[in-house]
Structures are given as structure tokens and as C-alpha cells.
């Protein structure tokens, strides 16, 4: 496995809608393994392929080490880490919850976002099998966050234009300072 380079805002690849994967083959599995290694290396709980400069509909998640009140996987046969290819999310309740989220592509930022509390996600797994998972709480939030990346949506897109511009300017300064070292 390899640790891949993370892409940070305002990189244009993060604003693209990702392409579906035709089949989960060995090269896709290698990408999934590398994404998982990259996510762990950067202390993340989720990662989408566009965050490593790959415009494919793939996400990886692992909330097992996060201290959260509720992390509901309501299908007991599912264990972490989760690998989702071509995920399709639908709400199974109209209840939304607002909470702060962070993102590996938006370092040092925490942004409040309202998301569905309960969802159902259909996807291809690591072995190209079609799966359906019902999720609630933080897992549902994390899945929705990562799927946003596949649709070219970033946390800053939930902010007003003024706050969005200020946040992106801050990120540019952080990035510039890192390159100057």
C-alpha cells in the first residue's frame, strides 16, 4: 500500500463530479487500499477519491477509533473499514441534525452542516458485490460528507459567499506558507 498525496481546496479537481466505476477490479482495489492507508496516515475517518486527485466515485470510511455517542450501522454484518464504490444515498427519515465537520481537504477548518440523520446507501463493495447499508448518526453524516466530494461539493459550499471566500483565502495562505518552508 502507498500513501497518496492529499488535494486541498481550492484545487479544481475537488469541484468536479466524479465518474462512476465500471467494475471493481484489481486496480480499483489497489486504489481503495492506498486511499485507506492515506486516510489512516492523515488521521481521517473518511476519504473520497477526488481528495487524492482521482475523479472516481469511491469512498473509504472507518469511524471505529472515533469517540462518538452514536455510530449506528443498522445492518450487523457490516464492519469497519467500509469501502463504497458508486455510492447512492437516499434519506430514510426527514430528520436532519446540524453539527461541525472537518475535512482533510480543508485543513484546520470546522464548518457546521445540516445532514440527514438516517440514510440508506447502495454501493459496490471491495469485491464488486452490490450492497445496501442503513446508517444513522455520525456514520450517516460521514457517508454524506464523502459522497458530497464525489459530486464536487465541499464544506465551504454550505457557507455564505463572504464566509466561503474568507475560508478559501485562509486556506490559500496556509498552503502558501507551507510551500515557502
Swiss-Prot record:
Domain of life: Bacteria
GO MF, any single term: peptide deformylase activity
Catalytic reaction equation(s): N-terminal N-formyl-L-methionyl-[peptide] + H2O = N-terminal L-methionyl-[peptide] + formate
Active site: 146
Cofactor: record remark: Binds 1 Fe(2+) ion.
Annotated keywords: Hydrolase, Iron, Metal-binding, Protein biosynthesis
GO biological process, one term: translation
Names of the cofactor(s): Fe(2+)
UniProt enzyme class: hydrolase
Record-listed E.C. numbers: 3.5.1.88
Keyword Manganese: no
Record carries keyword Metal-binding: yes
SUPFAM superfamilies reported for this sequence: Peptide deformylase
Sites where the protein binds Fe cation: 103, 145, 149
InterPro entries associated with the record: Peptide_deformylase (IPR023635), Peptide_deformylase_sf (IPR036821)
Pfam families documented for this protein: Pep_deformylase (PF01327)
Stored PANTHER family: PEPTIDE DEFORMYLASE (PTHR10458:SF22)
Family recorded in the similarity comment: Belongs to the polypeptide deformylase family.
Summary of the function given for this chain in its UniProt record: Removes the formyl group from the N-terminal Met of newly synthesized proteins. Requires at least a dipeptide for an efficient rate of reaction. N-terminal L-methionine is a prerequisite for activity but the enzyme has broad specificity at other positions.
Entry protein name: Peptide deformylase
Taxonomic lineage of the native organism: Bacteria, Pseudomonadati, Pseudomonadota, Alphaproteobacteria, Rickettsiales
Amino acid at each position: 500500500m502507498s500513501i497518496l498525496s492529499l488535494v486541498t481546496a481550492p484545487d479544481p479537481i475537488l469541484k468536479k463530479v466524479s465518474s462512476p466505476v465500471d467494475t471493481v477490479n484489481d486496480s480499483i482495489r489497489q486504489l481503495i487500499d492506498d486511499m485507506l492507508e492515506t486516510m489512516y496516515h492523515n488521521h481521517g475517518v473518511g476519504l473520497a477519491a477526488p481528495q487524492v486527485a482521482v475523479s472516481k466515485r469511491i469512498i473509504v470510511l472507518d469511524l471505529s477509533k472515533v469517540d462518538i455517542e452514536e455510530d449506528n450501522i443498522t445492518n450487523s454484518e457490516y464492519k469497519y473499514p467500509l469501502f463504497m464504490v458508486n455510492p447512492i444515498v437516499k434519506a430514510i427519515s426527514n430528520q436532519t441534525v446540524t453539527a461541525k465537520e472537518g475535512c482533510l481537504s480543508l485543513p484546520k477548518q470546522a464548518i457546521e452542516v445540516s445532514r440527514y440523520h438516517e440514510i440508506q446507501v447502495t454501493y459496490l463493495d471491495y469485491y464488486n458485490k452490490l450492497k445496501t447499508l442503513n446508517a444513522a448518526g455520525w456514520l450517516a453524516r460521514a457517508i454524506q460528507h464523502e459522497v458530497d466530494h464525489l459530486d464536487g461539493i465541499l464544506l465551504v459550499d454550505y457557507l455564505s459567499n463572504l464566509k466561503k471566500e474568507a475560508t478559501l483565502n485562509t486556506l490559500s495562505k496556509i498552503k502558501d506558507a507551507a510551500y515557502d518552508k
